[in-house]
């Protein structure tokens, strides 16, 4: 994991997956276990929100963060954004809980019965080392395929089931979800006037955007699975071909997505309808920037939009610090030299 000095470092429990950097079988088990916790959280919080949901109070003022997303997907809601059936929310929460147990079993299985390194198993296709660009590209490609399938699934959902359209106040389908894809590429893609992607205001463009991104991700997945990184790319991105380098790049991506999600959820009322998330937010500054509700709410009450936006913003900020830390270490800088330098000055 460490890219400078001694590479044989014994990490404590607090170091997370760093302990398994050279034991890819346990690395896989750790990822499956983390997926279990994420899905467990999603299921448990969904059921918790169903239990406390009050139809007489606007959804956006109840401190809910998961049910509003389900409602925006057109699940359990009717005209005017009125929740007509909460059973789908309960069912979705229960499915997530059950799925988390399946993931947990998979993690335990890989710890107890799986090989310590993936290459020792019956299927060594995904065996890798941190300095092997070809295998790392193969794994990246499969990640991109899964992301692309997720985007295409949303296109299918909006085509056959429909989502809530805040411009008409009802659930509707988009019969031709790729009809405006040229607008997405040449207008939203270049932030032309009245085509800021953060302010997309119709479902046709939202669907076409997902279709375009889905195709890009799937194409990228196929490319990285079949094509080893070019020599110039390996030289340019040499610091990435290490455990710490890949961690830093992953954190950079998470940070970028977090900032984008924070601003998008703060200002967009199509993907985040006012009926479910509350009105758009206002940006204010103190020690750090933060977003506040633009309407008066009871003391101690914040809209779902405020919760989502600010949590994404601050998580993205701290993840960015993690990226910088690990990126600097990945290029070989030893932070211990800083403390040693201060110690020398004090003496």
UniProtKB/Swiss-Prot annotation:
Keyword Transmembrane helix: yes
One GO term (biological process): photosynthetic electron transport chain
GO cellular-component term (any): photosystem I
Keywords per UniProt: Chlorophyll, Chromophore, Membrane, Photosynthesis, Photosystem I, Photosystem II, Thylakoid, Transmembrane, Transmembrane helix
Gene Ontology terms for molecular function: chlorophyll binding
Cofactor details (free text): Chlorophyll a. Chlorophyll b.
Transmembrane segments: 25-45, 64-84, 91-111, 206-226, 247-267, 308-328
Cell compartments where the protein resides: Cellular thylakoid membrane
Membrane-topology annotation of the record: Multi-pass membrane protein
InterPro entries xref list: PS_antenna-like, PS_II_antenna-like_sf
Cofactor(s) of this protein: chlorophyll a; chlorophyll b
Primary localization: membrane
Family the entry assigns: Belongs to the PsbB/PsbC family. IsiA/Pcb subfamily.
Subunit and interaction comment: The antenna complex consists of chlorophylls (a and b) and chlorophyll a/b binding proteins.
Biological function: The antenna complex functions as a light receptor, it captures and delivers excitation energy to photosystems II and I. The Prochlorales pcb genes are not related to higher plant LHCs.
Protein name according to UniProt: Chlorophyll a/b light-harvesting protein PcbB
Organism: Prochlorothrix hollandica
